[in-house]
Amino acid sequence: MRTVILGVIGSDAHVVGITILERAFEAAGFNVVNLGVQSSQSEFIDAADEHDAEAILVSSLYGHAEQDCQGFQQQINEAGLDVTTYIGGNLAVGQDSFEETRETFKALGFDRVFNSETDPEEAIEALKADLGHRSREEASSEKVQLGS
């Protein structure tokens, strides 16, 4: 069973969304480690390392995710983790264009960025595709190493 880390980053205390996501991802066959609300970057990273997670799913609804996520990808890399990272929610105060917001978070290193109206099934299908693609890449990489 694939493990994902889920939580609300920073000072955000919105719990309903991650509860819905936790149940949806579990129903889809994932092992979900739910950090709850007001989680720090290091809590996500430590949990991903401890549970050998394949993905980190970050939620934020209070509009300050950009500040909360500065340096997150760098810390993930420094920890030596190879994880897929998603973020979703109401990520920016007064966001004019979600495309601009998406580009901001892609530049911060997130693999996928979702708005607050995204159906959980969309994120689940995206993660299955991303992890499936990743498994194929790892398998072919291992074959190359074995054949060398």
Curated annotation (Swiss-Prot):
Entry annotated with the keyword Isomerase: yes
Reaction catalysis annotation: (2S,3S)-3-methyl-L-aspartate = L-glutamate
Swiss-Prot/TrEMBL GO biological process terms: anaerobic glutamate catabolic process; glutamate catabolic process via L-citramalate
Pfam families: B12-binding
GO molecular function annotation: cobalamin binding; metal ion binding; methylaspartate mutase activity
Pathways involved: Amino-acid degradation; L-glutamate degradation via mesaconate pathway; acetate and pyruvate from L-glutamate: step 1/4
PROSITE patterns referenced in this protein's UniProt entry, alphabetically: B12_BINDING (PS51332)
Ligand binding (adenosylcob(III)alamin): S11, D12, A13, H14, V15, S59, S60, L61, N90, L91, A92, V93, G94
InterPro entries registered for this protein in UniProt: Cobalamin-bd, Cobalamin-bd_sf, GlmS
Function: Catalyzes the carbon skeleton rearrangement of L-glutamate to L-threo-3-methylaspartate ((2S,3S)-3-methylaspartate).
Subunit structure: Heterotetramer composed of 2 epsilon subunits (GlmE) and 2 sigma subunits (GlmS). GlmE exists as a homodimer and GlmS as a monomer.
Protein name, UniProt field: Glutamate mutase sigma subunit 2
GN (gene name): glmS2
